[in-house]
Amino acid sequence: MGKYFGTDGFRGEANVKLTVDHAFKVGRYVGWYYGGEHKAKIVIGKDTRRSSYMFEYALVAGLTASGADAYLLHVTTTPSVSYAVRTEDFDCGIMISASHNPFYDNGIKLLNGNGQKIEAEVETRIEAYLDGLIEDLPLATKEDIGRTVDFASGRNRYIGHLISIPSRDFKGLKVGLDCANGSSSAIAKSVFDALQAKTYVINNQPDGTNINTNCGSTHIEVLQKYVVDNGLDIGFAYDGDADRCIAVDHKGNVVDGDKIMYVCGKYLKEQGRLKGDTVVTTVMSNLGLYKSLERESMKYEQTAVGDKYVAENMMENDYSLGGEQSGHIIFSRYAATGDGILTSLMVMEACVEKKATLCDLAKEMKVYPQLLRNVRVADKKTARENSKVVAIVKEVAKELGTDGRILVRESGTEPLIRVMVEAGTDEICHEKVDRVVKVMEAEGLIVD
């Protein structure tokens, strides 16, 4: 059976790996699956890619053909779909987006009734249907055919929700926003304007093909220059669907997800709002984050890479803050998934309440030099479990001791082994990574 869903939904080049036929069938199965005992209600959002409209129509056709009602949020963010599912009694949410990928890619992300990424068993059933392993589903007829409903009001309610969160307004503060020509273009400025910030926005003119192109959280250098050149107090960059956020302080320094978790974790702990005094991270967070959390008497948990796993850990243990270095940050009091705009509001609240600049708050965390090398291999499992690779990794880990670490893991979406080392200097990082890669090369595991 084919494996279509990865760590972040069904994603690939539009009409190459992910086709309108796939989207129609996903709609057919989802509409049938959730309509077993009642008429299913499914809410759909999309980002600004040209192909997002095409996939939206295909999904709606599939859903309504199976008897489900499809509610359209139109261009919006992934977290707004999650919010709508949780608060408006929908059975399921669908976001059409490939997040930070280039415009020619797209994806289908499914959210369960709690607004979180859908269970793996449901994805497996959809994959079986896509492969023809499940018999044809019945078509709705007459009045049982589903309706298509304009639900732009749901996006407006989400905006109101965001505005209600900060404890104070941001009056007088000059805030730069890089919307990546993506979903946040329709939302972010109105939120900050309502909170009385002086808002400066770039890359908020989507044309269907410019999403993430030299802009947004994956091209943070654009916002760095903009903040410094315009004398702004702070800046925030989002990705295509605005479920992640990277910040920039007034000096142009990048504040990534690890530093954001430190700043917000310390602030929430001081406020008595950090449940269990614990921050949930992934194995890719910087060693400096862990040492800084320990210094401030905070605990931490580590999960596999992916905000899906962070969210699961937070829900199981009732934690209030977690996230990834990449900027997926979850504040469980307000959201079930990573939310870039919410994250920027919480960073702003910490700065305003503590009467401090982001530069001052973030510099308390020392970042350890980190080197990540992606190695293309013929077979990920074979490469990772090779006895000589295992031996060199253990040897390097022993040498690093408590002043560094090594992590070797498989990519969830590509034929890559990721070799990551953190240590006291860049030179040590390079030396350790080189040794591991040379062993992989000598073992004939690497492909060009």
Per-region residue spans from a language model:
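Phosphate-binding and adjacent anionic-ligand microenvironments
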Residues: 234, 271-448
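An N-terminal, well-structured beta->alpha segment
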Residues: 1-61, 65-66, 145-174, 381, ...
